[in-house]
Amino acid sequence: PKHAYLAATSGMDFIVKIGRLNNLSFSGTKEDGWYIPEAKQAMQAQTLAYAGKYNAPDVEQMLAGDCDLAIESTMILHNPEVKEQLETCGIPVIVEHSSYETDPLGRLEWVKFYGALFDAEDAAEQLFASETAKTADVLNEAPTGKTVAFFYVTTNGGVNVRKSGDYVSKMIELAGGTCITFDDSDEENALSTMTIQMETFYEQAKDADYIIYNSTIDSELTSVSELL
């Protein structure tokens, strides 16, 4: 594809890293929704245009810009009529499932998918090899015993945390830590996060060795006092 539409946000970093950002013409995310500098810069330079969210794409704009592929996340499966509309208009749709990967290295390996898609397989293989090499020493080390709370506070005051089977929790484990979780590890649920009351979070996280605030979802914090 030379003029793709990207609604699967998790793919942007891979696309940038393999040098294929110029193959994207349309974004399903607005400029202020990107935390990847290259994506923001492309939208500022108007080489990447916002063409509506995944569930309400501007098909006319995409057709006028010769869109030749829509890269969707599994969210599009909740709106099959949108996928059908794009395909009826001659825009192929591919649904990537990287969000279903619970293993951090499994998620990383999706760079090979994008390498194959954008004819950059060598770059993708090199990136995967170099990044996995960085983890080799860490994976051979014994667990540190340190506990980690990974979260953000929602607009209504709840606390969003990762579930025990989520890739972020597993990434913390791979790094030698123990992610504080609040769910039943045997629970069958496709969601990777859950929202709990602040009191519940505080009770279990107050003695954590480290707290990591997920500012990619919410606005950044500059001090601990902002949590109070």
Residue ranges, per PLM feature:
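Short, structured coil segments at secondary-structure junctions
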Residues: R20, C89-G90, A175-G176
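A ligand-binding cleft/hinge motif common to bilobed small-molecule-binding domains
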Residues: M75-T88, Y213-L227
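Solvent-exposed, polar/charged alpha-helical surfaces in well-ordered, non-transmembrane soluble domains
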Residues: K2, M12-V16, E60-A64, E84, ...
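Short gly/pro/ser/thr-enriched loop/turn and capping motifs at secondary-structure boundaries
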Residues: E31-Y35, Y100-P104, D218-E220
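Flexible, glycine-rich surface segments
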Residues: N140-S225
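A short, structured surface patch at a secondary-structure boundary
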Residues: P1-G65, L69-I76
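Solvent-exposed, acidic/flexible segments
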Residues: A7-A8, K17, G52-A56, M75-N79, ...
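Extracytoplasmic substrate-binding proteins
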Residues: T47, E60, A64-S73, L77-G158, ...
